[in-house]
Amino acid sequence: IDALLLTAGLLESLGQFDLAIAVYRDVPADDPAYHVAELGRADALRRSGEEEKAIEVLEQLTRSHGALAVVHSTLGDVLRADEDFAGAILAYNKAIDLASEKAPVRWVLYYSRGIAHERAGDEVASEADFRAALAINPDQPQVLNYLGYSMVEQQRNLDEALDMIERAVAASPDSGYIVDSLGWVLFRLGRYQEAVGHMERAVELLAVDPVVNDHLGDVYWAVGRAREAEFQWRRALSFMDRGSMDTEADPDRIRLKLEVGLDQVLEEEGAPSLKVGNDI
């Protein structure tokens, strides 16, 4: 059985998903490693684009091996990726109920459920889960960054958000998304000059990410570097045009910034204007 699992895993790592799926299916249902094989088969199905079949495999596994937290958490991950956030939350609920109070993985479950709540629009439940994850793993950079960035986007608790993101950067200094968050919270706080270096570093780390390039454009605009801002906004648009990248960047808003400038866009949105004298 170990040889079958090893072979299937190797085939999957080589992108031979159909062959991997076939090998995973050779593990008998009465074998103690059956759930491992089925989790592998579901992953191979998902990676081959067969999300619905992957979900079917995992749902069947919840019926045959429902006492295992990993089965429910994996189902939650796939449902969340499929944007079935309500279903993902239910799966994570079950995983959290089953996981030992002392299990190191519990923070991951709260973090994952927090993302599902956030994507479903429940900011209160989302924050509660992120804080539960931090209670278990206080310096986890992904959680610190996600919660900090969420608060920045909601324009609240900015000082706490800055502290969280600074801790995240200290723990993971080469993560472009986390460095971007630090630059962005400084921008939101009106500390534009301080934001420049962090945003430039984020673009170095994530050169083709449209959101990061858009953010750098906004920061450049705020410090009076209009031509460089327009260049970054055009870069952001070009990376969005190259494919169906899942991104929070709004191409229409970027085009409007290119047409009338960031100040005018903020005014039309009823958002706070950029601060004058921002070296604070």
Model regions: which residues?
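Terminal, low-structured helical/coil segments at or just beyond the last alpha-helical repeat
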Residues: E230-I280
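Residue-level recognition of tetratricopeptide repeat
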Residues: G9, D43, D77, I115, ...
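TPR alpha-solenoid repeat register
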Residues: A3, A37, V71, V105, ...
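Register position in tetratricopeptide repeats
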Residues: S13, R47-S48, A81, S112, ...
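Structural marker of alpha-solenoid helical repeat scaffolds
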Residues: D30, R63-H65, L98-K102, I136, ...
